[in-house]
Amino acid sequence: MLKHLKVPESKAQETKAFLEDCKALNEGFLPIKQDGYVLWPLNFEVEGEIIEFIGSPSNRVSRDYRLKLPLKIRKIAPRAFDIFGNIAIIKLSDESFEYSEIIAESLLSSNPNVDRVALDLGVKGEYRVRDLEMIAGESDFVSVHKENGFEFELDISKVYFSPRLAMERQRVYDMSMEGEQILDAFAGASPFSVALASKGCNITAVDSNPQAEIWSNNNFERNGVSKSNYTFICSKIEDIVSDLPTYDRILMNNPMNSLPYLESLSHKLKSRGVIHLYNIIDKAEKFEIQDFLGSEFECVFEREVHPYSPQSSLKVFDILKSFSTVQSTNQ
């Protein structure tokens, strides 16, 4: 069985371009059409509706790195990994850790655009950055990541950035309108903010990590986006929230710790404004917005962005300060 990304046929080509851009498309297998949907074969998991399906082999050489491993190691090597620019980022179990060098070399030889492999040891510190150890290639965590027509350069060991949110960033970009006032409350290297500012939205980006400010400014310049409608505030959001104005849209991309800030930030939302809340939640748990906010708020959209563990998922919740019809989808 092979992991596939399921998308409507109408979005097949733009999805293919995205998967090729982030090197997630498994060219060893063919896409499968099924009841108005296209199933794209994956090298590694991305956000969206992921299903396991028998792959349809292509005549091209497969880039599944595990096929180059001895059978004993192949069984315990991770299927999924992230790619940030030219860096592959993997998590290893205790069982597979002793084979890290062999696994890393197989990743390098199977992905020609990857020149470094980093071991992900979890998230550390108040700046929620990855605890990384380079296990193959030059010990340099700076790379340039391309997505949705933008380039983001940063040190992935010093600034928060999730390659798996590329389609989510595109979704929010498509929803936004020129002139909107937007608060990016946990900005990191500002991938949301750069794209939205390029569309003419007025952005206030906030992050307490000084490295985030450095790389955010760099990414605005790198993408030729004017800073005339962009302000970066290097601070903890709780220290400045009372002084902030109101916004049409608020981004809360702090999956491990968003909920404690939801109530205070909700007071900074205009009528008919939207909060995009990213939160890791137990798969069996149902999110009830009234457990956190008043009756004037409603969750109008939710979906799984990607699995986080066997028991939990990263989900996005669009919270409207008004009334609307609730919809839920994994597409």
Q: Model-predicted segments: where are they?
A:
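SAM-dependent transferase fold signal centered on methyltransferase-like domains
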Residues: 1-331
